[in-house]
Every structure is written in structure tokens, then in C-alpha cells.
Amino acid sequence: MSSQSSNTESLSRFPLWQVITPVRRKVILAMALAGLAALTSLGALLFLVWSLRDIRATPDAIPAWPLGGVIGCVVLTFVLRLQAFNTSHYAAFHLENILRSRLARKALQLPPGVLQQMGSGSVAKVMLDDVKSLHIFVADSTPLYARAIIMPLATIVILFWLDWRLAIATLGVLAFGSVVLVLARRRSEDMAQRYHKAREQVSAAVIEFVQAMPVVRTFDSGSTSFLRYQRALEEWVDVLQTWYRKAGFSARFSFSILNPLPTLFVLIWSGYGLLHYGSFDFIAWVAVLLLGSGMAEAVMPMMMLNNLVAQTRLSIQRIYQVLAMPELSLPQSEQQPQEASITFEQVSFHYPQARTGTALQEVSFHVPAGQIVALVGPSGAGKSTVARLLLRYADPDKGHIRIGGVDLRDMQTDTLMKQLSFVFQDNFLFVDTIANNIRLGAPDTPLEAVIAAARVAQAHDFISALPEGYNTRVGERGVFLSGGQRQRITIARALLQDRPILVLDEATAFADPENEAALIKALAAAMRGRTVIMVAHRLSMVTQADVILLFSDGQLREMGNHTQLLAQGGLYQRLWQHYQQAQHWVPGGTQEEVVENERQ
């Protein structure tokens, strides 16, 4: 806990300007242009005062040079500001692309379990909202920052040159408003953290509500999921209201003080007194009024910028928390497996945020190359965890996992993935054509090979029956297809990869009875010559496996083939009996019980 807090603390102090290093030159150029625009806008005011002085001295003459200076400075100010914002926006787009690319590459290098713990809402917020927040800062704030700094400094210098007394009066108003603003900011730092946390929860609730819509409408008309979303939204609104109560008055009061009107009032009142006693020139007084009120107007964006900077710092903190997450360890000198055997050696593992105990406890087994191994057991026994660890979902807490005698941690990720193809129960299809979904990982595969893989996976017939065949585009996550159809497409995808190890996690979970036998036969042909790890709840799938591993409570309890395990009379035998009873179950009892009741 302490290391995590210290890491967060160090990230919170991460220099804001260091983040923009890839686009620093463009940002500096944009700020320089904005600073020059601020100076030329002051020049326009000075030329205007010069024009008033000449008109007062010689009313019949037109002050051509001063008026020309006003027009020239106004045009130059417009051009410089336009170029400043163009430059800063191009820099922001470039930085946004860099950060999203870095985050995407980081996500590919993180253990999948870490991303699952973060949740889709958190990941989406970092890659979308937080990066967008940094884009807004670079695009809009950096030129305003330059103007908000350069213009007041230059104005103060000119005011002291005109009259030090009025300059001090102007500084007094700005100092008072700034103190109030700082106090308001201190009160809002903790609330800003709570605000972003609440917004993250709303984002996660929205994603869950939309993705689970078909399920929740079927079972509870969406009331439970909507209630979760409603509570997240209410908490977010509550944070906003609390934030407004704590810092609202101070923020509004500072806005009022730093408004040009209070400064203008002070300068009119004090300047009139000086003018009345003859210690001040009227034209100089006009210059002070124009410059002083303009300085207050230039400082106004600083208040909004301070809030934006605070929000940007939080976004940067979250971005760099993701970028600082530990990646899967990769070897400096890689070892290549020479064959497709699988070995688990005293492997223990627990899910970091799980409330239960360890998912696997000192599991050891060896699978020779080319064997079909089935993993069975009650729900939560650790079967899917074995499959996920084989894919480096995470590294085990203890022990070693080897392919071909090589520890997974001694392989590069690409090398490991070239050994494995897999089909999970929770399949995923992209919004693309069916052919491209099957080609995933091998985009240059000819259509003939795609069709061949689909035939083996028993998917060709239903694909051919679609209006556009293999060019049919599937919806988000494959929503336009049935569960069984999606599963067969993912099986075809795995078969097309033609890798020596095949991992199946409930690959036939969505197969209807008509196609289950054909699918099992097709898979048997596809498994030939490969090492297969098959997680199964349907025990009919495992009877022909070379070895069956039975798990219970995270431990490997029994090992053997179907006949051997039945002969042992242990947990597998009881599971098989329950499975057989379930297969013969009809409403009113098993088929035998129904027949016996009818005889009576």
C-alpha cells in the first residue's frame, strides 16, 4: 500500500510541461506568437493614446501615423493570434496521436489480467477523456497562458512608467483577487479527485448498461442495471453539488474582483483625484484606464486556466499511472521451444482482487506433444485459470510453466503467440467482414484458406447462406450472429492460424444438438497432430481425451483417461453420474423415473 501511494504521489508531481516534450518546439512557437500578439495589442492601445493626444493638441489635423499604427497593430495581432492557435492545435493533434499510440502499445504489453482489473470504463476514460483533456490544454491553453503572463507584465511596466501610484493600485486589486482564487483552488483539489472518480464510475456504468441491454431487458426489464447507472449518476451529481458549495462562493468572488470593472473603478477614482490636484496628465490617465482594464481582462483567462491545469494534471497522472504499470517480464536472450509439450511445475496463482483464496495451489502436470488433455471440475475449480496462465494472462505467484521445456518468461510475446491458438467461451468478433474476422492475425490469407478453415469449423454452410457470404459485416461483438455461429467463426480463426498448441475453453458451449456431433468430429480432425488443452463442462467432450485433469478448489485432484478415472470411483465418477442423469432428465424426473411412474 505504501509503495502504491508513494508512486501515486510521485506521479502527481509529474512536470506538466515535460509531457509535451514531443511537441515542445511547436508549443513554444505558439506561445511566442501569442506573446507577440499580446505586445502588439498593447501597441495598438498606445498608438490610440498617441492619436488622442495629437487630436487634442491639433483638432483640425488627422493623426495619420498614430492611426496607421493602430490599424497595423490590430491586423498584426489578429494574424499572430491566428497563427499561434493554428500551431498549438497542430501540436495538440500530434501529441494526442502520440499518447494514444503509447497507451495502445502499453495495453498490448500489459498482462490481460491487469486490464481486466482496471475495467473497460477506466481504460476508455484514460485513452479518450484524459488524452482529450491534454489535447485541450495544449491546443487552447498554451497561447492563452502566454498572453495571460506577457500582457500583465508588459502592462505593469508601462503603468509604472506612466505613474507608479496607479500601477500599485492596479496591482493591489489583482493581488486581492488572486489570493481569493488561490484559496478557492486549495479547497477544490480533493473535490477534483472525487469528481473524476465519480465520472469514471458513470462511464463504467454506461458501458455496462449498453452492452448488457439484451440480458437485463430479458430478466429484469433493465431495472437493476439502470439502478446501478442511476446511483453512479447521483453520486456524480452529489460530488458536483458539494464541490460547488465548498468552492463556489470563493470562485465567483474572485471572478468578480478580477473582472475589468473593479480595476477600472479604482483607476477612475484614484486617477480623478490625482488629476484634480494637477499631479497627473489627462492623456496619461486615459492610457492608464485603457491599459489597466485591459490587463484585468487578460488575467481573467488565468482563473479558467488554473482549473484546466489542475484537471490536466489529474489526467496526466492517470495516463502515466497506466504507462508506469509493470509489463510482463521479457527475456534479454530468448529461448525457442523445439516441440509442443506443456509442463506445469508447482504452479500457484491468485487473482489480486479476488475475495476467495488462491485460484491454483501447487499444480503440477506434464502434457507430451500431440496429446489431447481435458480439464474438468466444478465451477471455480481453476480450469480456465490454467488456460489463461498458459497464455500469460498473468505470471504465476510460484512455480514454472513451460512449453517445449522453455519457461514462458524466457520467451518473447510473439514467440509464445506463435505456439498457441485459442478459443475462449467469451468470444469476440470485430465490426468487420466475416472473412477478415477469420483472418485475424493473418490478414494476407487467401479466401480459399479462409473457406477451408470455416468448413472444418462447420461454419461454411451458414456463412454461404448469408446475403454477402464471407463479405458480410458483423455487428459490434458479432451481435448479428447467434452464439453458436460466433463460436464457430472463432474456431475457424484458431484453425487458420495452424499453431502447434490449441487451447479450447468451452469451445462447444453454444453448439446446438444438431451440430454438436459434427463440430466435435471436425475439432477431432483439427486436433490431430497438435497439443490440445480443452476446458470442458460437457463431459461427453472429454471421453476420448488422452488425459483428463480433474480440478477442485484450485488443486489437481485426479489424473487419467476416462476409463481409469471411472474405475477410481472418485470425484470424476460422481461428476459423470450427475452428467448422465442430467442427459436423461425430462420434466418430472429422469426418463427411467417417468417410465416407472407410468407403470405404477
Region locations from a protein language model:
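A hydrophobic transmembrane-helix motif
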Residues: 39-49, 76, 144-185, 243-287
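Transmembrane helix-loop-helix hairpins at lipid-water interfaces of multipass membrane proteins
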Residues: 21-80, 160-165, 282
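Membrane-integrated ABC transporters
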Residues: 1-41, 61-66, 84, 88, ...
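An intracellular "coupling" helix at the cytosolic face of ABC transporter transmembrane type-1 domains
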Residues: 18-25, 112, 129-138, 142, ...
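Cytosolic ends of transmembrane helices, especially the final helix of ABC transmembrane type-1 domains
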Residues: 221, 245, 295-322, 331
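Helix-to-loop junction immediately C-terminal to a conserved catalytic motif
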Residues: 391
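ABC ATPase nucleotide-binding domain helical subdomain, centered on the C-loop/LSGGQ "ABC signature"
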Residues: 101, 400-402, 410, 417, ...
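C-terminal portion of ABC ATPase nucleotide-binding domains
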Residues: 2, 521, 538, 543-600
